[in-house]
Amino acid sequence: KPDGVFLGYMLGGDTLFELRTSLLLAEQERQGGLSNHVSPMTDTRDVSSLLTRAQFTLQTVDMDEIVVHYPSMYELVQDLRDMGESNAVVNRRPYMHRETLLAAAATYQALHGTPEGHVPATFAQIFMIGWKPSPDQKKALRPGSASHSLKDVL
């Protein structure tokens, strides 16, 4: 619909980088190989490109990070399962050995743990908005065409 708005939200960027790096390091050490155990994430540039390809105008894409602290990696993983945020990657190892999981939890605590004994989990939120084109829609002005300086206003 002309001049229709699209509002979107998704997790992306470096979401769960602490968990991702801990799992990769433990798996490399214990099993001699790597498998993705956290779903891949997109970044703001990809979201902007997607909005452009979908022919949205007047786009804005913003990102904010939230850090949530958990008692250990196990509570974080349980929360992710409860949210239905299990790994959706098709070509991955179907399970992780117990010793690898224990090593990942120890690595997580050693690399990212707080003095209080908690582990942080970073969630990078991507917010997006775009408008469908319309003949009456406002157009962005040409750079440098302003009649007043921002310095004068501030």
Q: Which functions belong to the PLM regions below?
A:
Residues 1-2:
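Helix-to-beta-strand junctions that scaffold the AdoMet/dcAdoMet cofactor pocket
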Residues 54-57, 71-154:
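C-terminal lobe and adjacent flexible extensions of AdoMet/dcAdoMet transferase-like proteins
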Residues 5-73, 83-94:
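Conserved catalytic/acceptor-binding region of the Class I
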